[in-house]
Structures are given as C-alpha cells and as structure tokens.
Amino acid sequence: MLSAGLGLLMLVAVVEFLIGLIGNGVLVVWSFREWIRKFSWSSYNLIILGLAGCRFVLQWLIILDLSLFPLFQSSRWLRYLSIFWVLVSQASLWFATFLSVFYCKKITTFDHPAYLWLKQRAYNLSLWCLLGYFIINLLLTVQIGLMFYHPPQGNSSIRYPFESWQYLYAFRLNSGSYLPLMVFLVSSGMLIVSLYTHHKKMKVHSAGRRDVRAKAHITALKSLGCFLLLHLVYIMASPFSIASKTYPPDLTSVFIWETLMAAYPSLHSLILIMGIPRVKQTCQKIXWKTVCARRCWGP
C-alpha cells in the first residue's frame, strides 16, 4: 500500500517527465527542422539539438530508474544503467558549456589578444574537447564494466557491499564534470564582466536609448544562471539518491532525490524555449489552439 507522500512524489515525477519530454522534444524537432530548412550546420542549432537530445534521454533514464528500481534492486543491468546515466549527464553538461561559450563568443566584446585568439578558435576547441571527453569516458566505462564481472578481492575481513563499490566507480566517472563546469563558469563570468562594462559605456554615451546588446546579455545570463542553479541541485541530490539505493534501500528517499534531479532536464528545457522567440511563439500558438479546441469540445 503506497503512502500519501510517496503517491504525491510519483505524481510530481510524472508531471516533470511529461514537461521534459514535451519541452526537449520540441527543441529537438525545431533544431533539426532548422538544419533541414537551411541545409547547413548552424553552431547554435547543433548545440541545442545535442543539449535537448541529451536531456530527452536523461529524462527517460530517470523515469526508468524510478519505475524499475523497486522491482529489480539487485539487477546487474540497472548498474549499467546508472553508468550510462552518468555519461549522458556529462554530455548534457558539455553541451550546456558549449552554449555558454557560444553566448560568450557572440555577445561579449573584449579587445584583449588572448580573448580574440580564443574567439577565433572556440568552435574547433569545443569539438576537440567533446572528442576527448568521449574517448576518456569510453575507457572508464570499459574499465568499470570489467570491474562488474570481476569484483575486487581484498582482505576477507574487510568486505564492502557490491552496490557500494559500484557506486564508488560511478562517482569516479562523475569526476569528468569538473572541466566543463569550470569552462561554463569562466564564460558566464566573462558575460557578466562584458555586461558591466557595456552598461557603463551606455550610461555615458547613449542614455535613454534602447539597448539591444544589454538585453542580449541579460537573456543569455538568465538562461545560464537558471541552468547553473538547476545543475547544482542535480549534483547535490545525486549522492543522496545513490546512498538511498544502498542496502537497505529507502524508496521514499529515492523518489525525493530523483524528483529533485528530474527538475534539471525538464525545467531548463522550458527556459530555453522562452529564450528562443520563434519556438516560444509556436508553443504559444499550439497551447492556444489546444485551449480553444478543449472549449469547443468541452461540456
């Protein structure tokens, strides 16, 4: 018999799943359609496609874990699912980092030679970082996969549960998040500095004039700031979710922490949609037509 609290958590998890599924699905369809329409790879569309695609998969992984964990707590494939989860989560972070670098490249205006050099090579550097990430994490995945088949045989007087050391290796995989998070913070900091210097120039030279560049700065910072907040919640909730799954597992705690984690891929998709005028207008039209159709067919 489910408790009222657990039933409420399940309802919240389903709502978050539907929001993330629709939001990220809309972004994937839009970015792919833009690529088909223009017949050329736009950096922005490619980043949004990768980011939304990773979030779409991440949303499914969270709901699968919540659905299957109570039934198959000791299943070996669930452990592989947790490793794949870490890889997709890190890929999502890398694409969010590329988005912050893209904003920084398009919006900021600095005259320092080092910045100009990085600005010219930002796209190629990003591709090399992504390639290096996949190679390193592929090697780590193979290593951890071998560990699953050959658990460590240490001193018989000191034995750790299989689940505990498995999650320890999942934490090792998660260490790949440090580099993209640092790059994200640096590029976001450069956006803040650029906004501050631009604001000072505008106060001196063009007071009262509509400032399009400042608006672009603020829109980008809102998106990146919300991402950082949601990602920090995701990171802080992850260890508690893992701890809740160790023996004896606490199902209510698992739902609490993974519901908090699910807010990251679902809510940020809405923030991205609000920052893309064409997608926002399309979603508003669809929502308005849905409401009108419901009124026409309603009682």
Swiss-Prot record:
Residues in the Extracellular compartment per record: 1, 67-82, 149-175, 245-253
SUPFAM superfamilies xref list: Family A G protein-coupled receptor-like (SSF81321)
Name of a matching Pfam family: TAS2R
Gene Ontology BP annotations: detection of chemical stimulus involved in sensory perception of bitter taste
CDD domains per the UniProt record, alphabetical: 7tm_TAS2R
Superkingdom classification of source: Eukaryota
Keywords of the record: G-protein coupled receptor, Glycoprotein, Membrane, Receptor, Sensory transduction, Taste, Transducer, Transmembrane, Transmembrane helix
GO MF annotation terms: bitter taste receptor activity; G protein-coupled receptor activity
Main location: membrane
InterPro entries: TAS2R
Chain ranges on the Cytoplasmic side, renumbered to this chain: 23-45, 104-127, 197-223, 275-299
Transmembrane segments: 2-22, 46-66, 83-103, 128-148, 176-196, 224-244, 254-274
Glycosylation sites (chain numbering): 155
Membrane topology, as annotated: Multi-pass membrane protein
Subcellular location: Membrane
Function of the molecule: Receptor that may play a role in the perception of bitterness and is gustducin-linked. May play a role in sensing the chemical composition of the gastrointestinal content. The activity of this receptor may stimulate alpha gustducin, mediate PLC-beta-2 activation and lead to the gating of TRPM5.
Family: Belongs to the G-protein coupled receptor T2R family.
Protein name: Taste receptor type 2 member 5
Organism, scientific name: Pan troglodytes
